[in-house]
């Protein structure tokens, strides 16, 4: 079992296609820009666990840090898509309906930078 995190942070680039003598979009994204997708990978097949819009992200907390903002005591643990224990993983807190949810995951620095781009309102703790 593995996990994949994808952040759609920019529009697909256009490339020149000589067949049409025009610039075309090489690929279409399955999600709008500003979306994060968390997937579980089993036998090379991905199952979507959660899809987040950048505007719904409330906080991204480093290992050992906790979200302490409004309604912090009512955060619901939704998923652990990390190969590490929850205490050693990053967490992302997001709004879903009227509730706050949390996912534990292990991003790299590049991923975190893209999250900062799509969710400038999010608290990084």
Segment roles from a protein language model:
Residues 36-40, 90-94:
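Short polybasic amphipathic segments
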């Amino acid at each position: 079992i593995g996990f994949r995190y994808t952040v759609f942070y920019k529009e697909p680039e256009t490339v020149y296609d000589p067949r049409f003598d025009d610039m075309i979009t090489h690929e279409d994204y399955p999600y709008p820009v500003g979306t994060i997708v968390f997937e579980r990978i089993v036998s090379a097949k991905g199952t979507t666990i959660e899809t987040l819009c950048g505007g719904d992200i409330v906080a991204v907390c480093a290992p050992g840090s906790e979200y302490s903002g409004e309604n912090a005591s009512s955060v619901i643990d939704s998923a652990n898509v990390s190969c590490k224990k929850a205490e050693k993983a990053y967490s992302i807190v997001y709004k879903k309906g009227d509730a706050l949810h949390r996912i534990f995951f292990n991003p790299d620095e590049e991923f975190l930078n893209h999250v900062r781009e799509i969710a400038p309102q999010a608290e990084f703790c």
